[in-house]
């Protein structure tokens, strides 16, 4: 299978590694530093303490270099949420009649952003649960279990056969479930990531601390209940059972887990704050639902996010 991975952060490198290890032709679009590092060594993937050196991955800094290949069978969009619309325009020439586009972003808007450019017939909604941290430009560590994906078409116009895509992902040790209602699935993940990630950033603590401190665990649950109320007001079929389920997922995370938004804020990089707690606020205001916990998260973290987006203050 021909796979294009657009974005070489932790999640992008993880999927590149496991798919290449399973024998698929993988091309990664990353920054020049990634291209340089890839020319010097194999991609290093660390899982459960084991280190694998994965070879055979093509790495380019300019997607135009990948356009000489046939259209991709699968395009994985692994950039940050605010970069998705630009990514859609960039990958459009590689989308053929049977190409599947799989966004891995946190939040609830990425699939629609892609579909607006590429057409909903190519785009899957996807909830991705994996803790993958890029430790060097060409090295990634997976904390905890291999990735779990819950996927589904975002419209009835989706026209691509899924069997081969699902099989390829499973061959790469990626757990895949087909969602009966991808909108509910995306909101469940949104409930999880915006709440534990937001409180983690607010407290500057990992899951091992926030899950075992009764006050922060309760705050995370209350933040999830805010997302529940917003989603229900938008017609999403969520219930308190979803809160219980997402809290169970949270408590099962590796104690060292932090969200990517939390890490970005701590390390002075632009974050997905606008697409997590910021989105909870936007969607809540649209239907008159108050979200005070997510407001506190957003307001307290916004100065750091603004500073990270100023070229003179951005971390290298």
PLM regions and their residue ranges:
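NAD(P)+-binding Rossmann beta1-loop-alpha1 motif at the extreme N-terminus of oxidoreductases
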Residues: 1-52
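Short, well-ordered alpha-helices that flank and scaffold nucleotide-derived cofactor binding pockets
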Residues: 17, 21, 89-93, 116, ...
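Residues at the C-termini of beta-strands that transition into short coil/loop
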Residues: 30, 49, 61-64, 105, ...
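Internal alpha-helical scaffold of NAD(P)-dependent oxidoreductase catalytic cores
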Residues: 37, 93-94, 117-124, 137-241
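Rossmann-like NAD(P)(H) cofactor-binding subdomain of soluble oxidoreductases
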Residues: 52-139
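NAD(P)-dependent Rossmann-like dehydrogenase/reductase catalytic/cofactor-binding core
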Residues: 221-316
């Amino acid at each position: 299978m021909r796979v294009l991975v657009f974005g070489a952060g932790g999640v992008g490198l993880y999927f590149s590694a496991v798919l290449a290890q399973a024998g698929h032709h993988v091309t990664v679009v990353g920054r020049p530093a990634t291209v340089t590092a890839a020319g010097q060594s194999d991609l290093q993937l660390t899982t459960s303490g084991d280190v694998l050196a994965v070879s055979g991955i093509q790495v380019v800094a300019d997607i135009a270099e990948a356009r000489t290949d046939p259209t991709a069978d699968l395009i994985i969009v692994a950039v940050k949420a605010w970069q998705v619309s630009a990514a859609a325009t960039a990958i459009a020439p590689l989308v053929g009649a049977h190409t599947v586009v799989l966004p891995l972003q946190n939040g609830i808007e990425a699939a629609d952003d892609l579909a607006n450019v590429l057409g909903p017939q190519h785009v899957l909604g996807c909830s991705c649960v994996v803790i993958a941290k890029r430790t060097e430009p060409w090295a990634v560590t997976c904390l905890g279990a291999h990735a779990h994906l819950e996927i589904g078409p975002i419209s009835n116009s989706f026209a691509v056969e899924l069997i081969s895509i699902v099989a390829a992902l499973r061959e790469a040790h990626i757990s895949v479930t087909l969602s009966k209602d991808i909108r509910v699935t995306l909101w469940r993940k949104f409930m999880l990531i915006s709440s534990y990630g937001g409180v983690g950033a607010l407290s500057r603590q990992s899951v091992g601390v926030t899950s075992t401190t009764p006050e922060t665990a309760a705050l995370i649950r209350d933040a999830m209940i805010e997302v529940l109320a917003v989603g229900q007001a938008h017609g999403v079929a969520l219930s308190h059972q979803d809160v219980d389920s997402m809290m169970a997922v949270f408590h099962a995370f590796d104690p060292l887990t932090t969200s990517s938004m939390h890490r970005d804020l701590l390390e002075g990089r632009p974050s997905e704050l606008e697409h997590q707690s910021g989105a909870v606020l936007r969607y809540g205001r649209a239907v008159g639902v108050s979200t005070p916990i997510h407001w506190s998260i957003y307001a307290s973290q916004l100065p750091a996010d603004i500073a990270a987006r100023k070229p003179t203050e951005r971390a290298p």
